[in-house]
Amino acid sequence: MARITVEDCLTNMDNRFQLVLVAAKRARQLSMGHQPRVAEENDKPTVIALREIADGHVGREVLDEVVAEEHAAVSSRISEDEVRAEL
């Protein structure tokens, strides 16, 4: 396993801040069971996410994806009015 550097990933990202957001979201997806797009090689999800970015398999588009679980979590929140009615 070769070490992944920020410079390896920045060739496919606009800036470091975007890189952090994309890597974090992709690592979260991998932790939740999404299939890696590169060989796992016994790496942690964060390293796999960075390798995917460096290889060009994952880009900014991952930020635009709305996962069903995320949507369900937002839609299932109790409204403030419902809480007040309970009190």
UniProtKB/Swiss-Prot annotation:
The keyword Ribonucleoprotein does not apply. GO terms for molecular function: DNA binding; DNA-directed RNA polymerase activity. GO terms for cellular component: DNA-directed RNA polymerase complex. Its EC number is 2.7.7.6. Transmembrane segments: none annotated. Signal peptide: none annotated. It is an enzyme of class 2 (transferase). One of its GO terms (biological process) is DNA-templated transcription. InterPro entries: DNA-dir_RNA_pol_omega (IPR003716), Pol_omega/Rpo6/RPB6 (IPR006110), RPB6/omega-like_sf (IPR036161). Gene3D superfamilies: 3.90.940.10. Promotes RNA polymerase assembly. Latches the N- and C-terminal regions of the beta' subunit thereby facilitating its interaction with the beta and alpha subunits. This is DNA-directed RNA polymerase subunit omega. The gene is rpoZ.
